[in-house]
Regions:
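N-terminal presequence-like segments and the immediate start of the first folded domain
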Residues: 1-62, 66-71, 76-79, 85-134
Length: 134
């Protein structure tokens, strides 16, 4: 049986509850929901990248990528991405940012789901991902 490996890149704070930012078991890597927090600074609380959807989306994608890389994966290994938005009016803008970000990706993820949710104050987007390596 393959062990589960918890993934927390140096750029991330320790989660506030009993979970990890990502978990790899065998060739499967699950990235927990990430938000647009800037890289962690010792002794400082998590800080959003900025007030705009663009700033937060790009930082959120960078945070997801950091966990993928920590687990030995890349965007090319991602099978599914879930995007959580706080406002349906952000859908078109998020799609434009998303398409620009993934423009050079050889094979796009097989699926993407967009869900509208409530997030902590000031946060506009959350993204999680499932990758299969190999």
């Amino acid at each position: 049986m393959t062990d589960k490996i918890a993934l927390t890149p140096k750029t991330h704070t320790t989660p506030p509850a009993k979970f990890s930012h990502g978990v790899r078991k065998g060739n499967i890597l699950q990235v927990a929901g990430q938000v647009g927090f800037l890289p962690a600074e010792e002794g400082k609380p998590p800080t959003p990248a900025g007030p705009t959807l663009r700033e937060q989306t790009l930082q959120t994608l960078a945070n997801v990528r950091a966990i993928l890389e920590e687990g030995g994966a890349s965007w090319e290994d991602v099978m599914m991405i879930r995007v959580y938005l706080t406002d349906v009016d952000h859908f078109a803008e998020m799609n434009a940012i998303y398409n620009e970000y993934f423009e050079g990706l050889v094979e796009v993820p097989a699926a993407r789901t967009t869900v509208y949710v409530g997030l902590p104050a000031g946060l506009l987007i959350e993204i999680d991902a499932l990758a299969v390596l190999g």
